Amino acid sequence: DAPVELGDPRIELYAAVARRSLDGFADANWHLEQRVSREEGLRMLTLAPAYAAFQETERGSIEVRKQADFSVFSADPMAIPEPGILKIEPELTVIAGEVAYERK
């Protein structure tokens, strides 16, 4: 749905898996049949952009010898109810193996 989304990975994942507005609204125009699984939504935010940038061997997934770029959230977005995805908070962000943000 880019470029209409806000760029926040929580909102992006929610939009992909729920196909609802931020307040939970959806009607026929939201095409709920186009929802994706959480696994596919995660790939859309991680490995797919790396692949599109020809960088899938360096980033896009957590693997040995890949650049360590990742975030840790206050809850598991793969396991909580869909509306909860919007409420999780970043706890830690690592970029190129260095801590860029840590919630105190």
Locate each region found by the language model.
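His/Asp/Glu-enriched, well-ordered alpha-helical/loop segment
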Residues: 1-79, 83, 88-96
